[in-house]
Amino acid sequence: MKAIHKSVLALSVLVIGSAHAFELTSKDIQEGHPMAKTFEYSGWGCDGANQSPQLMWKDVPQGTKSFAITAYDPDAPTGSGFWHWIAFDIPASVNELPRGVDISKLGGKESRIDYGTTGFGGACPPEKDGMHRYQFTVWALPSDKLNLD
């Protein structure tokens, strides 16, 4: 059985000036607790539903014009970790992503991840590789659009 755990909800901010702490939370994943099969990848030996978890954030830094979201596994045995999600150009008016969100319907974009696909790619660590940490980060950005694809 694969040990699939999410143990870190990380938050990084690129905009300075908020009087309050920019905070990321989720109803679907909790630090130090196993992730549900819903958030496991469908493929590469895993048979999850491959849905992104619900995420919400508050106390957005002043001057934020858009957001980016990343999900990263620093414990993947690749030498450089494993990127599970890269979403960007999410409008500043958005402060919550529902489970299984279609980023394009919000006006955002998603980039290629380490599975070789675009969009969210759930957890799927190699068998007998121990626990993995999945770091979800919301980036508050000072520009409306990034010149990325």
Residue ranges of model-derived segments:
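Bacterial N-terminal signal peptides that target proteins for export
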Residues: M1-V8
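N-terminus-centered regions that define maturation/targeting leaders and the start
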Residues: H20-D149
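Bacterial N-terminal signal peptides
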Residues: V8-G17
